[in-house]
């Protein structure tokens, strides 16, 4: 296993949590709120099996990823991670979204946290 260095953390990653908000018409809508932003490394790995799956009758991509960040105790499985990859023609951010599947401290040293994720698409 390659030793991790702080310089390997070159992606800005924002952790979000799903919540419900009420709009002006008193309807409840699900949305995500930003919790914190950290530096991290995003790596793909193909050893997790078939990356294609059938979604609503069409082929979609569910790409497994490993995200490494500095150790934190406040990560939860019901969060998601987003990474800005650019902007669209309106100037709005284009985001890659990752659902958290599992996480662990690989060396039990409280230095690094490896998060197994599933990429779920652009702009969540």
Task: Please state what every model-predicted region is.
Residues 1-14:
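N-terminal intrinsically disordered, low-complexity, charge/repeat-rich segments that act as generic
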Residues 27-124:
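Short, conserved turn/kink motifs that form compact alpha/beta structural patches or helix kinks used as
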Residues 14-21, 45:
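Generic short beta-strand segments
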Residues 22-26:
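Short glycine/threonine/proline-enriched tight-turn/helix- or strand-capping micro-motif at secondary-structure
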């Amino acid at each position: 296993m390659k030793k991790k260095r702080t310089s390997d953390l070159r992606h800005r990653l924002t952790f979000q949590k799903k919540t419900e908000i009420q709009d002006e018409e008193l309807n409840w809508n699900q949305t995500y709120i930003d919790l914190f932003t950290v530096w991290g490394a995003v790596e793909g790995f193909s050893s997790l099996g078939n990356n294609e799956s059938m979604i609503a009758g069409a082929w979609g991509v569910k790409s497994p990823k490993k995200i490494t960040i500095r150790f934190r105790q406040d990560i939860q499985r019901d969060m998601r991670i987003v990474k800005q990859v650019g902007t669209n023609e309106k100037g709005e951010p284009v985001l890659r979204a990752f659902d958290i599947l599992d996480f662990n401290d690989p060396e039990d040293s409280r230095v690094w946290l490896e998060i197994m994720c599933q990429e779920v698409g652009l702009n969540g």
